[in-house]
Amino acid sequence: MKQNSTIKKFFITVFVLICVNSWLIASTITIKQDGTGDFTTIQAGINAASHGDIVLAYPGTYYENIDFSGKNITVASLEYTTGDPQYIAQTVIDGQRQASCVSLISAETDAVLEGFTITNGQGGGQYWLLGGGINIFGDYPEMIGCSIINCVITGNVAYNSAGICVDEGNVFLSGCSITNNYAYYNGGGIGIKGHSNVVFDTINRCSVYNNRSSYSVDIVLASPFIHEFEVVVDTFTVAQPNPYFVTNNAYNTDFSFDLQNYVLEPVDHDLYVSPDGDDINSGFSPDEPMKRINTAVHKIASNTETPRTIHLAPGIYSKSMNDQILPFGCKAYVNIIGENQENTIIDGDISEDGILITSRGYEHSTISDLTFQNFQSIGGIITNYSDMIRYDNITIKNCIITDMLSALISATSGGNIAFENVTIENIEGLDTPNAAAWMNGTTGFSAKNCLFRNNTSSSSMTTSAGLYVNGNGDMTVEGCRFINNTTTSTNAIGWASALLLTDYNQFIGDSYIHDNLFVGNVNNNGKSTVYAKSMPYTKINFFNNTLIDNVSPYGCEFEGNIYCRNNIMRNIGDYEIALFYDPEITSYLWCSHNNILGGEDAIFNQFGANVVYWEEGNIDVDPQFVLVGDDPYQLAAGSLCIDAGTPDTTGMFLPPWDMLENHRVWDGDGNGEARIDMGCYEFDSEPWAYAHQPVVPAVDYQISNYPNPFNPSTTICFTVPQQGAVKLHVYNIRGQKVATLVDCVSAPGSYNVQWDGRDADNRPVGGGVYFAQLVTPQRTTAHKMILIK
């Protein structure tokens, strides 16, 4: 019995040693598509592998989407065992545009991928598809650990981070080529998030180039935890990367670059694009245009001294008609300008992509004379972390917005944003609190002569279907029309159907809301048509607005210091003005020379907690609108609102024109005294800029300038058909003469003169819109110019 026991113990010991030895010695699992290996698919080999094993794929194209499944293994081609780089191109993982080609998402800590071509992947995750080529996704503090060696990662797509996505991972990149991947939004090549640490091999260097996305085309970081990042590669797209190529969307990371080669020399020249152009063209002239807007943006230089412009020829730009890549981005100090918004159209084909998306580092740019239409996305034009951006003469229409954003949005911490002659109409917001436009965290904002019409927004709690601005600087809304915008809140009480101006991080500057028209806006399960807030040390100037037939419990809700002058307020609801109780601020309302339905009783002062100064000149009468034509809310003859506004407009900072660009202060009742009217229209006044313009004869007078926009100088060209006196003046947007460039008698012909951006006293003028006015005895005509600074 004792001998049998000893033998039994011996066999048990041997069995244990054999098992332990099998665990300690890595197995090599072969993958051959001809069936002569252990398996025919890489995933089958991974499923059979244990920690430390090698899954070795022989040449072939593997149409699969592999997952390391939490195993610390090496998955490699024969390049791993032979050192022969030819096996990289011969051993392909093709994701078939179904998901990420390779996923490491299950707590792998020491995995290796080596020697493959990774292509045709389409990201993983739910809505925001990430990592078309390789998706590395950890759960901090449990980080994914892996090495990616000698792989070619190309031809992959995703919403973000198309080539490689690293989220909470420690990743070593060695000898990889990451090129020609495309992300709809950012990170065409590599995207890095969270607490990740990505290290580039300084000996066996990677190359990252010619990837595409709307912004951060090669490398994007989206992390507040990565304060420094070193890019060490053999080849990059450009020699001196700017934020269009590399940036951190969430933090001002200190980037350093060690680049040995580059493939693109940015073109320091205006570029021309046409729907029937060709991207092999230089793009240097209208006669040799490029085709894709995205390609022109990628190619053009960002020049802080001499801003450049991408000129779009008339036509429709879309994926279906001329293979446009949407969305496209833009660089700092680059303008995108069409011929005019009627004939230069960017069409989204009702796809799920936006149209124009930018991020940190996008500044000093103008988008003008374009129409954006027919897109279905989380947002149409998205400009995050942007500063000194102008939108002039653009239309956004016939779009569907999903998932919380807007048709035009500066989503995070924007700087100074300006709208002029912007139309946003027929936008349907599905599960989004604001349909048309949302400016979030702007330093300064202005909207002038804009139209927000027929926009609808529905969500659990809506903000505004028209314009929503939460800013920490001064805000101006001037000469705008808000017509038939509708909000529907399905849960909590919503805010304002048409206009919402509020603070950002407990600060806001002065608000100037004047000469606007609000008609037919509807707030379902919400509060008001207009909401505006000031801080105790700032104020709201609410002057010369017309609010008619808007449906909401309150026409306007105010908080702070409000100066309410010269308005017409006659709406469908309980009160025209609401001042709610706030334990942290007492509101003060100064109200004079308004026509308010219900008079002083139409002001709701909750708990009597706020202070209302009901001053002189307020009335409650039928305004007597003309109710016909394109502007039916002009005052009719005999209206008691004519010449009934504030006698002295000093300190109101009103422009000299009304909604129709007629004189703002005019003697409408013919008593010999010019006085401002109530509302946004001045009765029977003459045009402001050209009040004494002669009748235009049928002769050929022409005026233009180039470049336009310009900095610091431009050449103004003009043609006169007959001999006579000629004057060429420059006016600013306020109608003030800046300079006289020509004052002489001229023979018929074409002439040009240079303007250096200085006024009559040789002082540099500020950036903005200017008009070159050509004056002859026969005709006065003008041309708009844009000075970019």
Regions from the language model: what does each represent?
Residues 36, 43, 51-74, 78-81, ...:
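N-terminal extracellular ligand-recognition/capping segment immediately after the signal peptide
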Residues 22, 26, 207-210, 215-276, ...:
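Extracellular/surface-exposed low-complexity segments
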Residues 64-74, 136-139, 147, 160, ...:
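Predominantly extracellular beta-rich ligand-binding scaffolds that present long acidic/polar faces
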Residues 35, 72-126, 157, 320, ...:
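Right-handed parallel beta-helix/beta-spiral solenoid domain characteristic of secreted/periplasmic
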Residues 23-44, 48, 59-61, 251-295, ...:
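Right-handed parallel beta-helix/beta-solenoid
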Residues 247-263, 305, 638-688:
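Surface beta-loop-beta hairpin patches that serve as ligand-binding interfaces in beta-rich domains
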Residues 110-184, 364-494:
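Right-handed parallel beta-helix
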Residues 695-706, 710-789:
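C-terminal outer-membrane/trafficking sorting elements
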